[in-house]
Amino acid sequence: MQASRSATRHLLRHATRPPSGFVCRSCLSRRSSSTSASPRSPPPPPPTAGFTALKSRRLISVSGPDAAKYLQGVVTANIINNNKTGFYTAFLNAQGRVLHDVFIYPDASKDGEGFLIEVDATEAERLTRHIKRYKLRAKLNLRLLDDGEATVWQAWDDSKADFAPAVGMTTPVRDPRSPMLGYRVLTPGDHAQTPQLDLDPTPETSYRIRRYLQGVAEGQTEILREHALPAESNMDVTGAIDFRKGCYVGQELTIRTRHRGVVRKRILPCVLYDHFAAPERLEYKHDGVVTAEGVPPETSIGRATKRGRSTGKWLSGVGNIGLALCRLEIMTDLTLPGEPAAALESGNDEFVLTPKSDEDVGSEGAPFKVKAFVPDWLRQGLAAQTAGH
């Protein structure tokens, strides 16, 4: 009787297990055909021009006589050189790991003594506490803005190389992380008060897909708090770090990596595919059988034909694309500085999401394969770094 009950529990546990992200959508559909539930369809491809409110971001006001001095000592960019316009940067911990990726904008209402810090909305309260804890005797005022006080927008138009939206009171900031991302725009009020742009509004998922296609990570679900390194997050290429400025928290490891270390891993855009041939180009597909929905964050990536150390780590995705932290000499054609080009072994140039256990793989499908791509802006930036050494 005890054995019968144990067998019944085993069957129930496996029968009710939620579908894994490693199985194709058609398999998931068959698995759930006896119920009304169905896998959520990925969003359609993003438009080539549009704007969207970034509800995933929030703003923190920092003002006072010591605001600039304080921020200069805790972020990776040089705020003295950027105090007239917005810029991209990061807060690090003492070990040189990323705490928060942020944009910082001058606050025109504070007479040159104020800034607005844009951060991952889920991390805004944490960053506010962090600043408050370490401001010591600095003369500054700190406040987390309510959602309805101001809104962060992203605007783009691929048909215009010199596109720069005119929005009245706000100053658009060109997104430095990729030439194709467009501009950041701040407006007072909530997202119902849209900026005056000759563009059509679009959901925030459009911006997310565009980020993934450009290989740009954002927020602490993609740039892992206290784990990610600035260079591995491509911050050394996107202008987030001033390597000539004075001391700041986390500077020692960052500078040492720049001058004496080798960055072996970087966040790259990736395509998921199944048994078909590896894709030749990075392309978003929302109507295929492969979907990143349900793939757990930080899932390991390994060689398809043999076991060994991890070659990467999946971070986030939508549809058939996503971001992963990839070992460059294994998953790409890039050659690391001072090292010979790695020769891929025959049959070992395919990579798969590696489940943590057998239970993570459905019986109807095999693990997804992963192909990493190096975006042009990153390839060019790394070439410029190599030439400058």
UniProtKB/Swiss-Prot annotation:
- GO MF annotations in UniProt: transferase activity
Q: Which gene encodes it?
A: CAF17
InterPro entries (UniProt xref): GCV_T_N, TrmE/GcvT_dom1, YgfZ/GcvT, YgfZ/GcvT_CS
Q: Where in the cell is it found?
A: Mitochondrion matrix
Q: Which UniProt keywords apply?
A: Mitochondrion, Transit peptide
Q: What residue range does the UniProt record give for the transit peptide?
A: 1-40
Q: Which intervals carry biased composition (Basic residues)?
A: 7-16
In its UniProt record, which GO terms are filed under biological process?
iron-sulfur cluster assembly
The record, for Pfam families, names: Beta-barrel_CAF17_C (PF25455), GCV_T (PF01571)
- For this entry, the protein name equals Iron-sulfur cluster assembly factor IBA57 homolog, mitochondrial
Q: Which family does it belong to?
A: Belongs to the GcvT family. CAF17/IBA57 subfamily.
What are the start and end residues of every segment in region (Disordered)? Answer: 1-20
By its UniProt entry, which NCBIfam families does this protein fall under?
ygfZ_signature (TIGR03317)
Q: Which GO terms describe its cellular component?
A: mitochondrial matrix
Q: Cross-referenced PANTHER family, in alphabetical order?
A: TRANSFERASE CAF17, MITOCHONDRIAL-RELATED (PTHR22602:SF0)
